[in-house]
């Protein structure tokens, strides 16, 4: 949709959190008549209403009234599921529904790198932005990390020039209502079971939402995917599908030398990372150089290689890629070293909301480990980590709604204790740990049973550790 098409249109915004508010203000500036509808009643309702109305936006809280369904089109916030009654009613009323990412893309002049996947999105987004920032400082443009990483695309899009780069982290929820969104570079880090409660327990439905990220790409665009991930490997090696995709495909692997197999690839050879996006190999750093306390482990080698491939696809010089990777200190709440107490390391991996993320944490951290796990379960199957738990974990402290499931999963493998607060969990873990051990918060679950988000869970864990 163009600016001219938006002007004078009636738009309903479903959801009044940060993305919804950013979308509402963007549309109002573009000349649309905007009505924001939020089912919950926020504590700061009066302040929020005043701010919205100052921007020419009408709003309601505590309901979705009939006015919503009189719109010419609607924008859905990422926290509102497609199965919500209000969305179903909009569809029955034949009101087009778009995501906030889709909306912002209508206004975007900058090059777009879009990153999705189950795990690794935020780290890849942050590192990719850092690489482009290094290049931009020397070549006169700006790079931005936007989207699901915390800064709505709609907040920033109007300030982006055609020379700038928008690195956008995108969830499956945000992709469900994208129709014309077209990134110059698309990245899919991996697909493992997650959010299956939103997809009828069907991982193929979840994967299909992720694949929407590349649906509008053309021959001039790039798609980077993890070929070591079984679901992605099967999807992109299907001969008929591969032949039908117009964009340049970049297969990425740490398990296989892909140099002779694919025209475009990124892989490891003789311990070094290699990019092959042209006819020539480009040798990067050795994998063992990615080994600081804050940025280490196999998963971060994948993340580094992925960010390198994304930057290389848009022509970034190797010196900026290597410099950025070597100086990268990781991202908060992702295997974040907090402190050592009595020769015990404490690591905050609150962002580990899947079993796959827990697997990488247990693979990375040296034994023995006292693990704090649990929260809101997302259909977890813990069998994948049984061998690690048996070999490396001294004890597990189970927390949250899934406490009993965690006890049942690991009770025959190691000692398991229950805690009913994060403070108690840290205290029990500290009592159980011995010199040389690591206390690891890696919940493998969502945080919403006990906390507002994983960031709050991580911050409270760090506070508890600092109080020991």
Curated annotation (Swiss-Prot):
Keyword Transmembrane recorded: no
Residues that coordinate or bind ATP: 117-123
Single GO BP term: regulation of cell shape
Entries under Gene3D superfamilies matching the protein: Mur ligase, C-terminal domain, Mur-like, catalytic domain, NAD(P)-binding Rossmann-like Domain
Keywords: ATP-binding, Cell cycle, Cell division, Cell shape, Cell wall biogenesis/degradation, Cytoplasm, Ligase, Nucleotide-binding, Peptidoglycan synthesis
Keyword Cytoplasm: yes
InterPro entries listed in its UniProt record: Mur-like_cat_sf, Mur_ligase_C, Mur_ligase_C_dom_sf, Mur_ligase_cen, MurD
Enzyme Commission numbers on file: 6.3.2.9
Pathway where this protein functions: Cell wall biogenesis; peptidoglycan biosynthesis
Subcellular location: Cytoplasm
Task performed by this protein: Cell wall formation. Catalyzes the addition of glutamate to the nucleotide precursor UDP-N-acetylmuramoyl-L-alanine (UMA).
Alphabetical list of HAMAP family matching this protein: MurD
Name recorded for this polypeptide: UDP-N-acetylmuramoylalanine--D-glutamate ligase
Annotated source species: Chloroherpeton thalassium (strain ATCC 35110 / GB-78)
Gene name in the database record: murD
């Amino acid at each position: 949709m163009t600016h001219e098409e938006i002007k004078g249109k009636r738009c309903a915004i479903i959801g009044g959190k940060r993305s919804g508010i950013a979308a509402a203000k963007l549309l109002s500036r573009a000349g649309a008549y905007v009505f924001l509808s939020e089912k919950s009643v926020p504590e700061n309702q009066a302040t929020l209403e005043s701010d919205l109305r100052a921007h020419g936006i009408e709003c309601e809280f505590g309901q979705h009234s009939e006015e919503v369904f009189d719109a010419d089109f609607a924008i859905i916030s990422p926290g509102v599921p497609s199965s919500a009654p209000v969305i179903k009613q909009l569809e029955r009323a034949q009101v087009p529904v778009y995501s906030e990412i889709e909306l912002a893309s209508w206004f975007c002049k900058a090059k777009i790198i879009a990153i999705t996947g189950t795990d690794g999105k935020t780290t890849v987004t942050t590192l990719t932005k850092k690489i482009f920032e290094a290049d931009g400082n020397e070549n006169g443009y700006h790079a931005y990390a936007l989207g699901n990483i915390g800064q709505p695309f709609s907040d920033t899009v109007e300030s982006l020039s055609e020379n700038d780069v928008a690195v956008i982290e995108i969830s499956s929820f945000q992709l469900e209502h994208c129709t014309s969104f077209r990134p110059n570079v698309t990245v899919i880090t991996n697909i493992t079971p997650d959010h299956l409660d939103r997809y009828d327990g069907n991982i193929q439905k979840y994967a299909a939402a992720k694949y929407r990220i590349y649906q509008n790409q053309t021959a001039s665009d790039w798609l980077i995917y993890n070929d070591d991930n079984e679901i992605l490997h099967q999807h992109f090696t299907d001969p008929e599908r591969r032949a039908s995709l117009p964009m340049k495909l970049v297969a990425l692997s740490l398990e296989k030398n892909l140099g002779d197999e694919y025209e475009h690839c990124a892989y490891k050879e003789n311990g070094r990372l290699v990019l092959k996006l042209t006819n020539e190999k480009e040798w990067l750093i050795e994998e063992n150089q990615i080994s600081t306390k804050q940025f280490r482990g196999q998963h971060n080698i994948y993340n580094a290689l992925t960010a390198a491939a994304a930057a290389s696809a848009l022509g970034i010089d190797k010196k900026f890629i290597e410099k950025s990777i070597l100086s990268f200190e990781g991202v908060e709440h992702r295997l974040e070293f907090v402190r050592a107490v009595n020769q015990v390391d404490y690591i905050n991996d609150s962002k580990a909301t899947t079993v796959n993320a827990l697997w990488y944490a247990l693979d990375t951290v040296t034994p023995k480990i006292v693990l704090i796990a649990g929260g809101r379960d997302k259909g977890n199957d813990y069998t994948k980590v049984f061998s690690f738990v048996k070999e490396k974990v001294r004890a597990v402290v189970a927390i949250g709604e899934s406490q009993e499931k965690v006890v049942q999963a690991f009770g025959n493998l190691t000692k398991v204790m229950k805690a009913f607060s994060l403070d108690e969990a840290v205290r029990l873990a500290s009592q159980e740990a011995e010199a040389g051990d690591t206390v690891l918060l890696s919940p493998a679950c969502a945080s919403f049973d006990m906390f507002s988000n994983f960031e709050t869970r991580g911050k409270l864990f760090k506070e508890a550790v600092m109080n020991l």
